[in-house]
């Protein structure tokens, strides 16, 4: 997960801009 707590998909899943399925990482837009 990139961005730490800012990327917490449980609390800020609406801020997740992109999900890279190839590397399994979340890219946050917020």
From Swiss-Prot:
Compartments where located: Secreted
Enzyme class: hydrolase
Domain of life (superkingdom): Eukaryota
Transmembrane segments: none
The entry's keywords: Blood coagulation cascade activating toxin, Fibrinogenolytic toxin, Glycoprotein, Hemostasis impairing toxin, Hydrolase, Protease, Secreted, Serine protease, Toxin
Keyword Calcium found: no
Coiled-coil annotated residue ranges, if any: none
Any GO CC annotation of this UniProt entry: extracellular region
Domain Peptidase S1: 1-30
Protein's job: Thrombin-like snake venom serine protease that specifically hydrolyzes the Aalpha chain of fibrinogen (FGA). Exhibits strong N-p-tosyl-L-arginine methyl esterase activity, and hydrolyzes tripeptide nitroanilide derivatives weakly or not at all.
Quaternary structure note: Monomer.
Protein name: Thrombin-like enzyme LMR-47
């Amino acid at each position: 997960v990139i961005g730490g707590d800012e990327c917490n998909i449980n609390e800020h899943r609406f801020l997740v801009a992109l999900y890279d399925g190839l590397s399994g990482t979340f890219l946050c837009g917020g």
